[in-house]
Amino acid sequence: MVVLGSTGSIGVNTLEIARRYDIEIEGLVAGNNYEVLNAQIKEFKPKYVVVKDLKTAEKIDFPNVKYGEEAVLDMIEKSKSDLIVNALVGDAGLRPTLKAQECGKKIALANKESLVNAGKFIDTSKITPIDSEHFGLWYLLIEKCRVKSEKCNVKKLYITASGGALRDWSLEDIKKATLKDVLKHPNWSMGVKITIDSATMVNKLFELLEAKWLFDTDKIDAFIETKSIIHALVEWQDGSTTAHISKTDMKLPIAFAVLDEVNDEILSPVNLLEVGGLEFRKIEVEKYPVWEIKDLLLIKPDLGVVVNTANEFAIEKFLEERISFIDISGIILKAVQKFENVNINGIDDVFEIKNEVRKWCESNFV
């Protein structure tokens, strides 16, 4: 297989599964973490290696290292692997997903932005999500429904949220939250962007939109489960509800995404007696302002590209300490208000609208 984003948390866990099951790694793509990448190259001996830029490429111990987005797309086209694992962060993952689809590859997808930006143009039958929530839904639905929930007696799908690092903070304290505060996730160890997205609840907005495309339904909602051991639930027409429970470890969804069949123990089971009580909370708009647009986003999924672009802009400015944490949500909501009537008819529209939203954000904020 080919692993895009090999030095991030998903990529590292993917290679751990590859190591365990002796899966050949044809290609590695990474950003600028050259030390981890060099160790991966030494162990897995890939045929292709691509990094973000020339500066990083000069530090890579590989005779024919390439750099840049075009090199990633070219590698996908040249590769003989059937499976592409896309664990790139943010918009960098969109074109590789489209290229992999064009080449008829199977895609193990951890890059949320691909479906958020361009879900209507992606054949989800070739995609397996690397995501605890969507994996949980798939696990609950696969036997009974063949994944498409409209074809069986599903009443509603639910995914859970941790609530992020500021979950137990007062509204007044949230206004003063620093980057260091926001990155202290209570349950998961993740990258910077997704940890911020967890704190704003943008991550869960994206996951609802992903679920819409993956499971072909608008009957999807979310709530907070504070221990993050229940990842997804299915509410059935007969009144019963089933839940997917597992530890907070991405190796389980990764294993199912990259292996045709999983019979081994990937994780030890959750000991429910040790867990004790579980706590469920409503996602409050007062604490998570972006939740205000949840229903609108499902009705008008073209807005996904607006939310994503405004969010990426806002996170950049937050990381530069030029805006506050609560400004992230404010910028997103104002962008949605400005571009509410956006209409995407082709993949080129996605990139045009991204540019338009980005320019608007740059001229109106900071």
Swiss-Prot record:
Keywords, sorted A to Z: Isoprene biosynthesis, Manganese, Metal-binding, NADP, Oxidoreductase
Cofactor(s), by name: Mg(2+); Mn(2+)
Positions bound to 1-deoxy-D-xylulose 5-phosphate: 112, 132-133, 162, 185, 198, 203-204, 207
Classification via SUPFAM superfamilies: 1-deoxy-D-xylulose-5-phosphate reductoisomerase, C-terminal domain, Glyceraldehyde-3-phosphate dehydrogenase-like, C-terminal domain, NAD(P)-binding Rossmann-fold domains
One Pfam family recorded for the sequence: DXP_reductoisom
EC number of the protein: 1.1.1.267
Residues annotated as binding NADPH: 7-10, 31, 33, 111, 113, 191
GO molecular function, one term: NADPH binding
Domain of life: Bacteria
Pathway: Isoprenoid biosynthesis; isopentenyl diphosphate biosynthesis via DXP pathway; isopentenyl diphosphate from 1-deoxy-D-xylulose 5-phosphate: step 1/6
Residues where Mn(2+) binds: 131, 133, 207
InterPro entries in alphabetical order: DXP_reductoisomerase, DXP_reductoisomerase_C, DXP_reductoisomerase_N, DXPR_C, DXPR_C_sf, NAD(P)-bd_dom_sf
GO biological process: isopentenyl diphosphate biosynthetic process, methylerythritol 4-phosphate pathway involved in terpenoid biosynthetic process
Family: Belongs to the DXR family.
UniProt xrefs under HAMAP family: DXP_reductoisom
General function of this protein: Catalyzes the NADPH-dependent rearrangement and reduction of 1-deoxy-D-xylulose-5-phosphate (DXP) to 2-C-methyl-D-erythritol 4-phosphate (MEP).
Identification of the protein by name: 1-deoxy-D-xylulose 5-phosphate reductoisomerase
Lineage of origin: Bacteria, Pseudomonadati, Campylobacterota, Epsilonproteobacteria, Nautiliales
Gene that this polypeptide is encoded by: dxr
